[in-house]
């Protein structure tokens, strides 16, 4: 596997700043793209090549709002997801397109998003496990080869969900940072298997994660999880909650943004020791701007 194009300088910068600052990450791509005109049935990854100017515009809005870390529009851009969504271009093309779209916004740092693959497996020597690991390896290499500063395996609901993905990402990483982010409930347990956040952090770090965090959970869940993660983790902690479930309308899902609540919360997360803060589904650059002001970025 050729790693000569990996962005080693960017990886060093990401690692250094995660260990010394509280960075502000951008908000979501998927829910913002859904709000575009007549976009309800368009898979987010489709935009990377078909409407790159739209993806770049959203990234630029986040940068203008104060985001220091951008996250590629590749949450569902594995070969499995592209096939499911009937997107013809290759994993390499779609993921490189997403990286190029984000780089147009001139971010300080750029993470490559990897979402759940959705294949069930039952043993590490099974065909399914090897398939997931290979799919993750392929996407990780595509993102790293396109120039991201690190990988972000996000919205992880169980250790079973994480295990082959983290293995595949590390197969491709060759020393590049791999961040892992879980989804937890208000009790601090993973949504998929009920494991507590401390045990999830221990597993991720033991198997090579360079950072641990939570995303796409409620503000209350994030507020409870952050100090527990900081107390148990040996790597930088990240936090990016959502605003809750959308209201379904005839024009598609509608979220009710609450930038003031996120602005208040991010101060507490920084005080607790979080290395990167941000927001997830249902927010926009409006929330990012409120957080940037609160953090004096």
Name the predicted role of every residue range.
Residues 1-297:
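Domain-level signal for soluble alpha/beta catalytic cores
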């Amino acid at each position: 596997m050729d790693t000569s194009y990996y962005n080693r300088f960017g990886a060093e910068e990401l690692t250094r700043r995660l260990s010394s600052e509280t960075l502000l990450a951008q908000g979501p791509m998927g829910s913002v793209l859904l709000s575009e005109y007549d976009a309800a049935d368009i898979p987010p990854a489709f935009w990377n090549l078909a409407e790159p100017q739209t993806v770049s515009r959203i990234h630029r809005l986040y940068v203008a709002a104060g985001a220091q870390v951008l996250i590629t529009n590749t949450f569902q851009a594995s070969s499995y997801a592209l096939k499911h969504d009937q997107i013809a271009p290759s994993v390499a093309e779609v993921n490189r397109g997403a990286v190029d779209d984000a780089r147009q916004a001139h971010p300080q740092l750029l993470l490559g998003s990897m979402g759940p693959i959705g294949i069930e497996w039952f043993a590490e020597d099974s065909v399914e496990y090897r398939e997931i690991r290979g799919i993750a390896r392929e996407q990780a290499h595509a993102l790293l080869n396109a120039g991201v500063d690190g990988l972000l395996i996000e919205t992880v609901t169980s250790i079973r969900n994480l295990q082959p993905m983290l293995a595949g990402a590390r197969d491709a990483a060759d020393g590049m940072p791999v961040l892992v982010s879980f989804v937890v409930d208000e009790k601090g347990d993973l949504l998929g298997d009920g494991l507590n956040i401390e045990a999830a952090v221990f597993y991720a770090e033991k198997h090579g994660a360079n950072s641990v965090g939570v995303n796409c959970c409620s503000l209350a869940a994030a507020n409870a999880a952050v100090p527990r993660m900081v107390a148990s983790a040996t790597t930088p902690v990240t936090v990016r909650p959502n605003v809750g479930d959308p209201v379904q309308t005839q024009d598609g899902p509608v979220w009710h943004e609450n930038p003031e609540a996120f602005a208040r919360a991010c101060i507490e997360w920084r005080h607790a020791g979080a290395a990167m803060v941000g927001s997830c589904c249902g927010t926009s650059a409006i929330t990012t701007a409120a957080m940037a002001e609160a953090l004096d970025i």
